[in-house]
């Protein structure tokens, strides 16, 4: 229980991302503590970095996070509406992308009528671009390292499907995408 160990006693903590690592450790993104930790199977912390969070909240600090092959971390910050890449040893932000609103007004809620930039998931592609599930932005964006959108799919672009809260992303071996869509 992340609220009872590793310095989190008495804090409201939510863990939104876990990743088993090749060395046998587990990466965990802790919202509330605002950090990424790598622990062994006994819960001992072997590495940690603090995250840059503009609008701290234990439910919205992070969503999906992944350790990249280069050792850095790619982290979605739902409350900040941003995806950040952190240098794996120092925690320095080395890349950041703020999810655009595309000139639209924010609308509360969780369904297709809501709108915002509460980003949920991101995947680093083999070409170096980042595929981003924009949460209540109802879209998936492919963004270059220079932050240029080179591909996107929006709320009503798929026949018979309305994108609402776009969450998870997976790139299949054949290059196709699996897109999580809920609410």
What are these regions (language model features)?
Residues 1-183:
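Histidine-/acidic-rich catalytic cores in large beta-rich domains
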């Amino acid at each position: 229980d992340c609220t009872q160990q590793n310095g989190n006693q008495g804090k409201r903590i939510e863990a939104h991302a876990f990743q088993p690592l090749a060395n046998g450790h587990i990466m965990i993104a802790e919202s509330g503590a605002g950090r990424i930790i790598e622990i062994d199977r006994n819960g001992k912390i072997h590495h940690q970095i603090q995250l840059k969070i503009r609008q701290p909240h234990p439910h919205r600090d992070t969503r999906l996070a992944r350790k990249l092959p280069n050792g850095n971390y790619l982290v979605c910050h739902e409350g900040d509406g941003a995806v950040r890449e952190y240098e794996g040893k120092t925690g320095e932000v080395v890349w950041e992308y703020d999810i655009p609103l595309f000139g639209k007004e924010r609308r509360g809620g969780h369904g297709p009528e809501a709108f915002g930039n509460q980003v949920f998931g991101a995947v680093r592609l083999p070409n170096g671009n980042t595929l981003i599930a924009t949460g209540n932005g109802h879209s998936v964006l492919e963004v270059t390292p220079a932050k240029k959108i080179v591909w996107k799919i929006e709320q009503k672009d798929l026949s018979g499907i309305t994108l609402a809260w776009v969450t998870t992303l997976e790139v299949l071996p054949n290059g196709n995408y699996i897109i999580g869509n809920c609410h």
